[in-house]
Amino acid sequence: MAEKMFAHQLSERGLADVVRVTSAGTGSWHTGDPAHQHTAHVLREHGYPTFHRASHVDDDHMAADMVVAMGRNHMRILRQLGVPPAQLRMMRSFDPRSAAHPLDVEDPYYGTVDDYEETYAVINASLPGLHDWVDEQLAARGIAS
């Protein structure tokens, strides 16, 4: 969900050719599967694209300028896989209100559409901070955003 939201927002800003956004799971059990039906529903309701095929984290993902984890367990696994600490952040750490909430973005997989809407809201609150981070990185490289 976060990948589709952020990539779409970057595209609307004209940055799709400058910033690459990918998504991958730390487990391989859903590799190749489409987005969960509730994820697709929520994304569609909010005007985002829904096409997705799940992938497993690989060297390409781990070499990104920033790897964003949704939960502490993902963070631990990504550290064990070798993602440098300076390149690893929790999604909610980009939300200015995150100090008032747990940093985990709850996985709604076994939940209702309402649970997916709640996850959407949590991600949506974090994305402005992630945009700010991208803008800072681009500015440091002399690229206008």
Where on the chain are the PLM-derived regions?
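Short polar/charged helix/loop
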Residues: M1-S145
